[in-house]
Every structure is written in structure tokens, then in C-alpha cells.
Amino acid sequence: AGDDMSSFKDVVGHKNIIQYIENAVKTDKVSHAYILNGEKGSGKRLLANLFAMSLQCQNRDEDGDACGKCQSCKQAASNNQPDIIRVTHEKPNTISIDDIREQINNDIVIKPYSSKYKIYIVPDADMMSVQAQNALLKTIEEPPAYAVIIFLTNNAGVFLPTILSRCVMLSLKPVKNQVIVEYLMKNCKIPEYHAQLCAAFAQGRPGRAVKLAASPDFEEIKSDIIKLLKNIHNMELTDLAASIKDINNYDISVDDC
């Protein structure tokens, strides 16, 4: 959900970050390394995709927003723009030094295929080993003029100070419930009570709210919450804790957005 957006105007919240990105694109003052720091489901991946799309767009508007119609935008929207590279990792919880060497260091020296920039998006960047981060240092210190690296993380605290000091940090704040509710009602075509419950459950993370709104588990979650609220006064503490844990477990299927 949400990844088919082709414009910053469609994003829920994060106006200050969008303004910063649009300004950088518009004035051509783009840094070589960014960290998008925010909780799971906060919208990091979407912002990174739109940032990359607008940097590569062949026909940007005066706000620095992507046109969504040129060849580059169409390629970016279907994830096959040759100069937007998403770094992957074999091991489930580690981005290794080999991943970084093969996918960034050895590749970044090759000029862009068809665009002004060559952009690397690194999801789960907090999984980079210390060796992987050290391997990146030289690249971040002396990047080619066309290179932009965007790290996505929910914990920027694990980066080495030498990496942090060379990146522009953009922190995603929780989005106000009312903003999420209005978005869900308009775009997911759901009634207000449904939208409010999704927004409350998402705790300021639009990506999570959108996934929840479309989730087949929604009715089940709703009845669990109502049951909990009705019985809360008569429940033993252990039962209460178990109920809350059950409700929180629905979160597992919400991938990062």
C-alpha cells in the first residue's frame, strides 16, 4: 500500500521533511548521503522513493516534485529505473561488508546509465555491520559527483559517529491522528469509526494505518479491542497483559513502509 504514489502531494504528514527535500531538489543543493530515521511504518521508504524519483525526473515542476509521466518517473514507479539501486542483503539480520562492497562501493564508480544522479537506497540500514559501515566511509567521504546514498533506519543510534557526521539526518515525527483519519476516509474509502481505530492503533505511523485499513484482520482486531475495553475493570492483570499482547501481535504482518 502507498508505494504507487507518484507525488509528494499525496504523502500523509511529514510536511517539513518534504519541504526540505523539495527545496534541495529545486535549488540543486543535494547532499551525497541522507539518513531517513523513523519507526517502522512511518513512511521512510515512500519518502526515499519519491526523493529518488524527483531527483531523476526529466520534467520536474517548480516545487521540485516529480512529474510522474516521463520515462524516468515511469521506470521509478515500477522499480526498474537503472540509476535507482536498492541495496539488498542475503542474511536476514545483517548487511555485510560484502553486500556493501558489491552493491555500492564497486558499483558507484560506474557512471549513471541514463540520469543525472546514481541513487542508492539502503533499507534496514541499522543492520549494517561495523565492518560494512567502515567500508562505506571512504565512499561517503569522497563520493562521485553524481552519487546519492539514502539510508533508511528505525534506529540511527547504531551508526558510527563517522558515518553520522557525514549524513544529513531527516527524522520522521509521528503524524497527527486527525491527519491520518482524514486521509484514510478519503483514500481508503472507509467510515470514520474504522479510520479512527486504525489511526489510534497506528500511533502516528501512516504506513501502518493504511495497511491496517486494508487488513482482513481488521474486524477481528476491532472486536478484540472492544472486548478488552468492556471487560477491563473485571480482568486480572495477567489476562489484561495477555489481551494487550494479542492485539499487539497483529503488528507482525505490517512490513516497513
Predicted segment positions?
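Hydrophobic residues in beta-strands of the RecA-like P-loop NTPase core, especially within AAA+ ATPase
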Residues: 36, 122, 136-137, 153
